[in-house]
């Protein structure tokens, strides 16, 4: 619900801005939860191998990212060579790693600026 509200009304934004909104909104959500709760969430996933094996394809955030990347592909601004699905999976794998690092550091640094630095590099996936 949080992500749906954060992304509402931004479907017409250009794909790079949509992707940044998805990632920054998710970072704000994760930070608001706090590192301890996020650590418990990941521990639960690790303790439930069936749950930890893959992303739920019906998850709103994943669908929003796929829609954004499909739009970028249709506009010819997504770099060729990788599928939209692989690219979305890459972003989630990377972001999960950033969140895990944040948890390992017990939330000692703000998550959003770290992600913003990474996104500046990732913008190169768009040919704009």
Where in the sequence are the language-model features?
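Short, structured helix-loop boundary elements
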Residues: 12-16, 20, 51, 55, ...
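C-terminal alpha-helix
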Residues: 68, 121-128
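Phosphate/oxyanion-binding loops and surfaces in catalytic or ligand/nucleic-acid-binding neighborhoods
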Residues: 25-33, 94-101, 125-128
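Short linear capping/connector segments at secondary-structure termini
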Residues: 5-7, 39-48
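Hydrophobic alpha-helical connector segments
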Residues: 4-33, 84-91
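Hydrophobic/aromatic-rich alpha-helical bundle segments in the mid-to-C-terminal region
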Residues: 38-41, 73-120
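A short secondary-structure junction motif
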Residues: 2, 30-37, 44, 68, ...
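Amphipathic alpha-helical packing segments from all-alpha helical-bundle domains
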Residues: 28-33, 49-75, 85-89, 93
